[in-house]
Amino acid sequence: MGFFHDFLSRPTTYAILAVLVIPVTALAWDRLPPLLPSAKRLLVGKKNPSKITSLECPYSYIRQIYGTHHWAPFVDKLSPSLKTERPAKYHMILEIMDGIHLCLMLVDDISDGSDYRKGRPAAHHIYGPSETANRAYYRVTQLLNRTGHEFPELAPWLLQCLEEILEGQDLSLVWRRDGLSAFPVQPEERVAAYRQMAYLKTGALFRLVGQLVLENQSYDDTLSTVAWYSQLQNDCKNVYSSDYAKAKGAIAEDLRNGELSYPIVVALNVPKGQYVVPALEFRSPHNIRQALRVIQSDQVRNICLTEMKKSAVSIQDWLALWGRNEKMDMKSEK
């Protein structure tokens, strides 16, 4: 003990220890893996995802969630004989509609930072955002190439609608990036701007199925109305449906992401709309709660549900095919 006491009491002892310990520590640290994942590492998915989902590909994963050829009822209504008279075209249209629709969902979930899709982990949480986005673009490119070679008469319809879908999505992303400074000020102009965005982003997807089947635009107005109803339904269930909140793992995901939706636009225009603005600019829990009280108020909720009912009047037969009917059962806490 005396030796160690004498050794530690010498002025040079700590210098000697530093000379020994620092290189050894540095050498050991150099061989350790990162304790926390880096931002770049988070872009990469989990190894061997097939062990988690039994599927290796993000597109196959989301297709398993939604099923295949879920646009078939629309195609059959537009052309009851297409399946038997031109089976190759029939199958190609269903593949195109699956591909465009589901790949948009894959990228949307990345943009929104969604945790779940229909109660299942969002694809990018398994495969990583980079691979998920690339697979989506890869699948769409495959469909474009195949359409151009096998069904060149369908290619112009597909390209035009895809451009409109992405134009609408771009508008939505710019509004989210720049906030209300990029959005109209007057109430009527706000609603019109939002409807135009939905006409592009959602409307073009629905118009696409009609144009591919009939190779004309004769059903554009009808399918645009179906699309507007679908957009309203999706927007409303985001803030009014408890079933949807459970499936997504969050309520008011649009608001939390700073993304405009029809209930948010309507809420901006009511007397207490000033409480919504801070939630879009500074998304603190307090601001979100204040905004939700307005968005889930009877006034805003009734305006939104009335618009849904109004848009549904002329398209009941199409909505029966669409078959989505979430309960809008959530209201503001008084």
From Swiss-Prot:
Belongs to the FPP/GGPP synthase family. It comes from Aspergillus flavus. Pathway: Secondary metabolite biosynthesis. Substrate binds at residues 101, 117, 201-202, 231, 238, 248. The gene is atmC. Mg(2+) 1 binds at residues 108, 112. One of its GO terms (molecular function) is metal ion binding. Its EC number is 2.5.1.-. The keyword Amino-acid biosynthesis does not apply. Keywords: Magnesium, Metal-binding, Transferase. The keyword Transferase applies. Mg(2+) 2 binds at residues 108, 112. This is Prenyl transferase atmC. Prenyl transferase; part of the ATM1 gene cluster that mediates the biosynthesis of aflatrem, a tremorgenic mycotoxin with acute neurotoxic effects. Synthesis of geranylgeranyl diphosphate (GGPP) by AtmG (a GGPP synthase) precedes condensation of GGPP with indole 3-glycerol phosphate, followed by epoxidation and cyclization by AtmM (a FAD-dependent monooxygenase) and AtmC (a prenyltransferase) to produce paspaline. AtmB is also essential for paspaline production, but its exact role has not been identified yet. Gene3D superfamilies: Farnesyl Diphosphate Synthase. Induction: The onset of expression correlates with the onset of aflatrem biosynthesis in stationary cultures. Expression is induced by the developmental and secondary metabolism regulator veA. Expression is also regulated by nsdC. GO terms for biological process: alcohol biosynthetic process; isoprenoid biosynthetic process; mycotoxin biosynthetic process.
